[in-house]
């Protein structure tokens, strides 16, 4: 009888049975899958898209895969029949935000016995902000001050909630009464529940520009690559700021922070030392605290203040949605690889390099 938590040895046993000449790159058709599939094609791999019925159109229209697995809902990927189908095609899963949200952390850790690129055991850390804080503190990365409960709010604060929500339900407030008022508003919208109240993560609001930094850590070369940066389009806050302040007050509109899209950004060159330092230190401490660490893509979401200092507020311990901004490469990936290196393609390049070195097990969990 197997243990509750999927072990590295179990994954290695699956990988040993794979036909290494017929590896298939696979992920859920959502979030940031398009460049995963295109990157796999560019690196010469077969592709499989797992699509929820009714959500397959983009992946069919862009000819994203040779094979499609259609499911009623994404969580059906946990069914043993589908898992066996994936293993039979020598599938390697690329995890992203929708994969984590829909498949579920418990199932990924305990039931989903298909090899994935990256560390399945660190995915829970990105969802639990106290664990993120531990990583930031160990890596000496500045973070916003945490406020210990709604009754302690005495300044402008950002209120967030765990999980890959795309900013849905986040809000800014400066008082306990404001917290209660906005919680009620979000509950009425159906974005939060009463149970979420106890899960609220409250931190000081840091004014600055958003920089989401996209890294790739290769366990084969022990190097961290900075491949791109982005910032987010958020509704309705980005629309509200176009309204004159007087009209905003009169309209009485409440800002929300739902991510609707992303656009690329380039930092001033003098800031890159900080960017590399944060990525290097985070990868180093993650390997010690949550072995084998941050394998593959990860993202540090930051604000850059007017003192030209990055303050980190979240991480993604897998491919982040902002990687969609460089499907054909970014200015930073161009410096390393020339044209056409998306994060999705970088995953497939890592698989190709691991196969050539007979080290596929080293990049999978």
From Swiss-Prot:
<dbReference type="GO" id="GO:0005524">
    <property type="term" value="F:ATP binding"/>
</dbReference>
<keyword id="KW-0067">ATP-binding</keyword>
<dbReference type="InterPro" id="IPR009720">
    <property type="entry name" value="IMP_biosynth_PurP_C"/>
</dbReference>
<keyword id="KW-0547">Nucleotide-binding</keyword>
<feature type="binding site">
    <location>
        <position position="31"/>
    </location>
    <ligand>
        <name>5-amino-1-(5-phospho-beta-D-ribosyl)imidazole-4-carboxamide</name>
    </ligand>
</feature>
<feature type="binding site">
    <location>
        <begin position="150"/>
        <end position="212"/>
    </location>
    <ligand>
        <name>ATP</name>
    </ligand>
</feature>
<dbReference type="GO" id="GO:0000287">
    <property type="term" value="F:magnesium ion binding"/>
</dbReference>
<comment type="function">
    <text>Catalyzes the ATP- and formate-dependent formylation of 5-aminoimidazole-4-carboxamide-1-beta-d-ribofuranosyl 5'-monophosphate (AICAR) to 5-formaminoimidazole-4-carboxamide-1-beta-d-ribofuranosyl 5'-monophosphate (FAICAR) in the absence of folates.</text>
</comment>
<dbReference type="InterPro" id="IPR013815">
    <property type="entry name" value="ATP_grasp_subdomain_1"/>
</dbReference>
<feature type="domain" description="ATP-grasp">
    <location>
        <begin position="120"/>
        <end position="352"/>
    </location>
</feature>
<feature type="binding site">
    <location>
        <position position="301"/>
    </location>
    <ligand>
        <name>Mg(2+)</name>
    </ligand>
</feature>
<feature type="binding site">
    <location>
        <position position="314"/>
    </location>
    <ligand>
        <name>Mg(2+)</name>
    </ligand>
</feature>
<feature type="binding site">
    <location>
        <position position="98"/>
    </location>
    <ligand>
        <name>5-amino-1-(5-phospho-beta-D-ribosyl)imidazole-4-carboxamide</name>
    </ligand>
</feature>
<keyword id="KW-0658">Purine biosynthesis</keyword>
<dbReference type="GO" id="GO:0006189">
    <property type="term" value="P:'de novo' IMP biosynthetic process"/>
</dbReference>
<feature type="binding site">
    <location>
        <position position="234"/>
    </location>
    <ligand>
        <name>ATP</name>
    </ligand>
</feature>
<keyword id="KW-0464">Manganese</keyword>
<comment type="similarity">
    <text>Belongs to the phosphohexose mutase family.</text>
</comment>
<dbReference type="Pfam" id="PF06973">
    <property type="entry name" value="DUF1297"/>
</dbReference>
<keyword id="KW-0460">Magnesium</keyword>
<dbReference type="Pfam" id="PF06849">
    <property type="entry name" value="DUF1246"/>
</dbReference>
<keyword id="KW-0436">Ligase</keyword>
<feature type="binding site">
    <location>
        <position position="262"/>
    </location>
    <ligand>
        <name>5-amino-1-(5-phospho-beta-D-ribosyl)imidazole-4-carboxamide</name>
    </ligand>
</feature>
<dbReference type="GO" id="GO:0016879">
    <property type="term" value="F:ligase activity, forming carbon-nitrogen bonds"/>
</dbReference>
<dbReference type="InterPro" id="IPR023656">
    <property type="entry name" value="IMP_biosynth_PurP"/>
</dbReference>
<dbReference type="InterPro" id="IPR016185">
    <property type="entry name" value="PreATP-grasp_dom_sf"/>
</dbReference>
<protein>
    <recommendedName>
        <fullName>5-formaminoimidazole-4-carboxamide-1-(beta)-D-ribofuranosyl 5'-monophosphate synthetase</fullName>
        <ecNumber>6.3.4.23</ecNumber>
    </recommendedName>
</protein>
<comment type="pathway">
    <text>Purine metabolism; IMP biosynthesis via de novo pathway; 5-formamido-1-(5-phospho-D-ribosyl)imidazole-4-carboxamide from 5-amino-1-(5-phospho-D-ribosyl)imidazole-4-carboxamide (formate route): step 1/1.</text>
</comment>
<keyword id="KW-0479">Metal-binding</keyword>
<dbReference type="InterPro" id="IPR010672">
    <property type="entry name" value="IMP_biosynth_PurP_N"/>
</dbReference>
């Amino acid at each position: 009888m197997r243990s509750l938590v999927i072990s590295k040895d179990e994954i290695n046993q699956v990988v040993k049975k794979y036909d290494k000449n017929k590896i298939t790159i696979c992920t859920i058709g959502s979030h940031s899958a398009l460049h995963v599939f295109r990157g796999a094609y560019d690196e010469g791999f077969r592709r499989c898209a797992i699509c929820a019925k009714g959500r397959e159109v983009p992946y069919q229209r862009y000819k994203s895969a040779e094979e499609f697995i259609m499911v009623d809902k994404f969580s059906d990927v946990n069914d043993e029949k589908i898992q066996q189908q994936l293993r039979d095609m020598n599938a390697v899963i690329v995890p992203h935000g929708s994969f984590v949200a829909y498949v579920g952390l418990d199932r990924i850790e305990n039931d989903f016995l298909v090899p994935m690129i990256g560390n399945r055991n660190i995915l829970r850390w990105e969802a639990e902000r106290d664990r993120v804080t531990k990583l930031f503190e160990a890596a000496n990365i500045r973070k916003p001050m945490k406020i210990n409960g709604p009754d302690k709010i005495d300044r402008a604060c950002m209120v967030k909630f765990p999980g890959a929500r795309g900013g849905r339900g986040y809000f800014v407030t400066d008082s306990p009464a404001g917290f209660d008022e906005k919680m009620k508003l979000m509950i009425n919208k159906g974005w939060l529940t009463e149970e979420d109240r106890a899960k609220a993560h409250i931190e000081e609001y840091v004014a600055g520009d958003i920089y989401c930094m996209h890294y790739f850590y290769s366990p084969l070369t022990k190097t961290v690559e900075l491949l791109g940066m982005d910032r987010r389009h958020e509704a309705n806050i980005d629309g509200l700021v176009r309204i004159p302040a007087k009209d905003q007050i009169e309209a009485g509109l409440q800002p929300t922070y739902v991510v609707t899209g992303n656009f690329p950004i380039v930092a001033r060159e003098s800031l890159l030392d900080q960017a590399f330092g944060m990525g290097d230190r985070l990868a180093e401490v993650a390997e010690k605290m949550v072995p084998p660490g941050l394998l593959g893509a990860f993202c540090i979401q930051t604000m850059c203040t007017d003192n030209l200092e990055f303050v980190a507020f979240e991480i993604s311990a897998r491919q982040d949605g902002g990687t969609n901004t460089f499907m054909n490469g970014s200015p930073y990936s161009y410096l390393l690889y020339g044209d056409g290196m998306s994060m999705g393609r970088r995953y497939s390049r890592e698989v190709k390099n691991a196969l050539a070195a007979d080290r596929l097990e080293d990049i999978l969990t």
